[in-house]
């Protein structure tokens, strides 16, 4: 059973969170074992606009994003609360060529509607990080591409338990409702390893949104409604547990 989405009232801070590069530099011998005492932050944005979609209890369309090894957090500084979202509950994350992140998330406490999923389009703003209140963002305040790659890496740390049924479910799964004008444009190589966040290659393709299925040289990750990740035809399916 996948973990549930939680409403939280404390955001990650320098006391309970360590940045990925700092953790790796200080703990190379146990880099693959994880750290139970602190969150490990792979990416984020201190000022992100919610372009479309709404979240319960959020009064403004501004938020902060934390891409942690354990979960994905959307935080409202104005309201003093946020949502801790397990990666198993993120059915799709994709990168739009306009610089937006497109997310389809399980509607578990996120929205008051009866819809099964919540769709969000988020636009990170890479303004002067020194003006941000959370010190974590003074060193790690990424754009959409940085956050996308961080989500790829962290999502790969949380494979689904029912891998033996994955192939059968792949053939029966209906496609997600991706806007028709967002077509595949580029493929971004990402092995899922923790040390390749800044080591990727972009190849030219068609116009529109970068989106794919599974792990490997893709630009989008999809999970089905049951929490399973589906690998596209011909693409390697890598499941790495670098940190837990």
From Swiss-Prot:
Top-level taxon in the UniProt lineage: Eukaryota
InterPro entries the UniProt entry points to: ICln/Lot5/Saf5, PH-like_dom_sf
Tagged with keyword Nucleus: yes
Pfam families named among the record's database cross-references: Voldacs
GO cellular component labels: cytosol; pICln-Sm protein complex; spliceosomal complex
Biased composition (Acidic residues): 161-171
Stretches for region Disordered: 156-176, 222-244
GO biological process entries: mRNA cis splicing, via spliceosome; spliceosomal snRNP assembly
Key words of the record: Cytoplasm, Nucleus
Localization per Swiss-Prot or TrEMBL: Cytoplasm; Nucleus
Keyword Cytoplasm: yes
Similarity comment: family membership: Belongs to the LOT5 family.
Protein name (Swiss-Prot/TrEMBL): Protein LOT5
Organism: Lodderomyces elongisporus (strain ATCC 11503 / CBS 2605 / JCM 1781 / NBRC 1676 / NRRL YB-4239)
Gene from which this protein is expressed: LOT5
